Amino acid sequence: WQGEPVFPNWKGYVDDTLAMNHMYTFVGYAGQGTLCVEPEAGVTGFNLFVNNRQINTAAMAAGGVWNVDISGQTINGRNTIQVGGIRPRGKKVTVRVGYPTVQEGSLQDVGIDRDALELLEQIVQADVNNGFPSAQMAIVKNGKLVYQNAWGKVNSYNPDGTPKTDSPAVTNDTLYDLASNTKMYTANYALQYLVTQGKANLDSRLVDLLGSAFVEDTIDITYNGYENPGLKVNKQWKAELTLRDILRHQAGFPADPQYHNDSFDQCAQKTVPGATNVLFSGWDGSAATRAATLKSIFKTPLMYKPGTKTVYSDVDYMLLAFAIEAITGKGLDAFLKETFWDPMGLTHTTYNPLLNGFAANDCAATELNGNTRDGAISFTGVRTATIQGQVHDEKCYYAMGGISGHAGLFSNATELAKLASVMLTGGYGENRYFSRNVMDAFTAPKKEDAANWGLGWWREGDNQRCWYFGTQAPSNTIGHQGWTGTLTMIDPVENLVVVYLTNKINSPVTDKAANPNNFNGNWYTASTLGFVAQLLYQGLQNHGTDPNNAYSALLEDMAESKFALVAEGGSVPATHPLVRSGYAVLEAMAAHANSTHSYMDRNYFNDALTLLDDTRDAEELAKLKKMLNKF
């Protein structure tokens, strides 16, 4: 329950503010809510108000339990219950308040302009038409699921990079590899719950949770270019590490020590053919290898003095997974399933989908040639086939058996939006997950000069995360991103959750010699994540005016910006994904003009065609001219 106040004097004493003794505030949304009212035996009458609206209590007999529908009285945000006039004096009335749940709704219900979403759809679809793999999106506002959509195929390319023609379409049920969004909705959620329950303390030391080996087994590694204070000092540093340090990404661990890679040079922090990885734990993903990985983390010396810098490290959240398992005595996946997923009815949220009832085509595929970056990378045991239904992240798959705090979770946009909505309310239905104090502690700026970080959570701050959350998001907007192309955004001011999932790395590597981590999918507007929030807020902020002129002007400006990027790319052919993404913006402009039947949009479109190169883009120019309908 969100609260179980016993009136009067629900705080347990008579407060001299007087009014407080009879009022209790809860978080709710308009159009939903139920109170469970239980008058004590002997009560002959009492008053009940919700947001100053009186509820008829005449039929609520003493000693009974009464479910009261308050959906007609609730508002979005803070709601107030008032209970008083209890007779005879000295008797009590208990009121139990549940948490809001996510219910079906529409964009119109919550004041989001449909045209803004149509513009977004035109951009994503045009990108998909020009080579972007797939995307999926869900929006929850004011406790209502108001938008779901999906674009593209579950697996868009063959291993040789040619388009795959026999792949099924993505649906709203398709599971995506969430990559680092896993961090928030597994390790952070688990710790927020455990701290709320009093079962964990953020200032608990890791050595006390995991045993003395966390410190004593540390070995000496000379990291190139780092302080390297010596083994004795390094052990002293590790001995004082707390959960809070880990959550801040300021614990001192290297970003990516690759415990699974037998030829990874820990001093150089890169793969060196013929090198021996002194922290190698295994690559088969077995339970034994997962246990060995914990021992490898124990051996890992810190790279810098804790608290002196922020280094985003997957090791931090691998370690948190083990800490949570030590606190709960359960596997991380089992704990999350029984605590969150099952009570919330989340049937498409899981680790290791192929081991939990899902088929490969239930999942959006990621890399085309295993973890090889199209043949640029090799290590013992590396996967070479297209990854689908298995976690892409190497450390999670090879070293952690697919179950970790840093990666491994799969879900779809709709279920993840429901899960993320808990950060707006603290619970779901009759399930209390996080206290307000705990949510505030985890989402507040971790330091005065680091407003873009909470404890694990990414924060908008002063436009410091606008590439992800847009420029209109308030400073306390939180969320995360994932390397596979995933975004979650939670805006507590607007009671808004946006989940946008892509599998942008389900595409060829653009130039594996220049950068084996840059996939074709990275070049498209649909991969930039923040454009979603930017357009959505446009649809929230029209203030009763017709926003279409602004949308049309913005679309041409986006085209100009895209072709400025094309120009920066130098002499690139028409087949390059950067150029294809430019074509996609122009095709979105054509689709927009066709939908609005506006001569202004036609003029914007024709003006944008001058951005094309007469020679390189001749074929596309002819195609675009045919796309514009006559009206």
What are these regions (language model features)?
Residues V65, N130-A138, Y157-I246, M303-D316, ...:
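Short active-site loop at a secondary-structure junction
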